[in-house]
Design a protein with these regions (language model features):
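Short strand-connecting beta-turns/loops that link adjacent beta-strands
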Residues: 80-83, 109, 201-202, 222-223
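Long amphipathic alpha-helical scaffold regions
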Residues: 94-99, 179-182, 189-191
């Protein structure tokens, strides 16, 4: 019962946060639109609906930080070789005014890339609840695989390819899929299922917390880790061949992956956990 109450509270907070991130911004957003770089954006209006496209490329230094937040729609990240990042965004709304009030801002330096939603006032959350003034975004990024990636406040599915740098995902209303984490990986506050593939693990390990959905941990044969699950409301199944279970109860599990090592922790899962090999 305590877990169910916790999950409900997480969902309520997540909805509030996503609303503010997607629509609000309030007094903290005092930034100019910086997406008119290398060609700018394209705007079109057809049959009463408006659409804006961003198609940009940027060069990033090794280990650059990439932050994606406040997106009302799906986010897809493809990992690529080299140091060039590509940003592809399609935004749609019922009117040009709604489109302008809910733009996507792209900010870039040699060591950072930010892709974020922007609202012109602090009333966006209530406007969203009333079903008005909404713009939808489809964000597709091609990023150097060694960047440090963080996404937060996403109202839609988040899909991330095989990254070598750290990956942090939080505040998602939708499914999360991470195709391959080699650095530190953390997933928090997701209203949807999570699939996390771990092919290697650094000393910081991996964390999955506050998930309202089934979690699938896909472990590579070379992974050595200590696995701890707590507060799981659902079935726990272990199918990976390199996992030795030391303790398993209805809502918890303690196991060793390979020869043991960095910690893989999962807490507050409302939907069960599957542990499989890749």
């Amino acid at each position: 019962m305590k877990l169910k109450i916790f999950i409900v509270l997480v969902a309520v907070v997540l909805a509030w946060f996503a609303g503010r991130s997607i629509k609000g911004g309030g007094e903290n957003i005092v930034a100019s639109v910086q997406q008119q770089v290398q060609g700018g954006d394209d705007v079109a209006t057809s049959h009463g609906a408006s659409e804006r496209r961003i198609n940009e490329s940027y060069e990033l230094a090794d280990g650059a930080h990439v932050d994606v937040h406040g997106i009302n729609g799906p986010v897809s990240v493809e990992a690529v070789d080299g140091n060039m990042a590509e940003v592809r965004v399609t935004s749609t709304a019922g009117s040009m005014n709604d489109l302008n009030e809910n733009q996507i801002i792209v900010e870039h330096t040699d060591s950072s890339l930010v892709v974020r939603g922007k609202g012109n006032n602090g009333w966006g959350f209530w406007k969203w609840l009333r079903g008005g003034g909404e713009a939808r975004h489809n964000v597709v990024l091609r990023l150097p695989r060694n960047v440090e990636l963080a996404t937060r406040g996403t109202n839609g599915k988040v899909t991330i390819g095989e990254m070598e740098g750290s990956v942090q995902v939080s505040g998602v209303n939708g499914r999360v899929e991470i195709g391959g984490a080699r650095g530190f990986a953390e997933v928090n506050g997701v209203n949807g299922g999570v699939m996390l593939t771990i092919t290697e693990l650094d000393k910081e390990g991996a964390k999955v917390n506050g998930i309202n959905g089934v979690v699938e941990l896909r472990l590579g044969s070379d992974v050595n880790a200590d696995l701890n699950l707590n507060g799981v409301n659902g079935q726990i199944t272990v199918e990976a061949p390199n996992v030795e279970v030391h303790e398993q109860k209805r809502s918890k599990l303690r196991a060793r992956v390979g020869t043991g090592g960095a910690a893989i922790k999962a807490n507050g899962i409302n939907g069960g956990v599957r542990i499989v090999g890749v």
